[in-house]
């Protein structure tokens, strides 16, 4: 439904990242389990500097590095929208949509209703990094070296999990192995 509203308001003249970002952001507002959520992989993308700059976010959908990066583009777009709303208000989004409908380029519309892109990018990076660092702070998100634990040896993984009970990789792998055995 959100796509219908935004596309009508912009006369179908809006970049995919902004359309998807608004929709995923709205999904999360409606219900916390809806929409793209932070994941260990997204956390790593953010902390490893793999976010696409806001001014080039359309490229994340057009030429992604991998299928995972396409999914991350949805999430990143939604947190850009979240950042805009938190820092510049909901009117900022509405004003950008209006300008897009008048043929204004997205980056110009953002600068007119939020901040210069360089300053916006700086603030957004701090915001996204904060979200990433706050994600599962008690979890061990490191993937062990294959020499440390053989990823093909189910018993070795269980043993390693017993020694590292908060390790997400070991938990996920053990669960997947148990499901496979069923």
Task: Identify the residue ranges that each predicted region occupies.
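A conserved position within tetratricopeptide repeats
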Residues: 158-162
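Active-site His/Glu-centered metal-binding helix of metallohydrolases
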Residues: 1-6, 22
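Acidic/His/Gly-enriched intrinsically disordered linker/tail segments
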Residues: 9-151
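Helix-turn-helix repeat elements of alpha-solenoid scaffolds
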Residues: 145-155, 179-182
């Amino acid at each position: 439904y959100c796509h219908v509203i935004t596309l009508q308001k912009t006369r179908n003249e809006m970049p995919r990242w902004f359309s998807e970002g608004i929709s995923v952001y709205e999904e999360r507002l409606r219900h916390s389990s809806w929409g793209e959520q932070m994941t260990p992989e997204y956390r790593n993308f953010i902390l490893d500097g793999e976010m696409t700059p806001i001014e080039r976010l359309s490229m994340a959908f057009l030429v992604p590095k991998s299928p995972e990066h396409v999914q991350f583009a949805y999430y990143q777009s939604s947190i850009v929208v979240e950042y805009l709303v938190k820092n510049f208000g909901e009117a900022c989004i509405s004003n950008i949509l209006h300008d897009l409908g008048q043929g204004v380029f997205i980056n110009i519309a953002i600068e007119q209703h939020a901040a210069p892109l360089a300053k916006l990018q700086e603030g957004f990076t701090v915001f996204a990094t904060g979200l990433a660092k706050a994600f599962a702070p008690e979890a061990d998100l490191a993937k062990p070296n294959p020499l440390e634990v053989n990823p093909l040896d189910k018993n070795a993984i269980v043993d390693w999990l017993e020694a590292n009970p908060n390790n997400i990789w070991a938990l996920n792998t053990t669960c997947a192995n148990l499901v496979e055995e069923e």
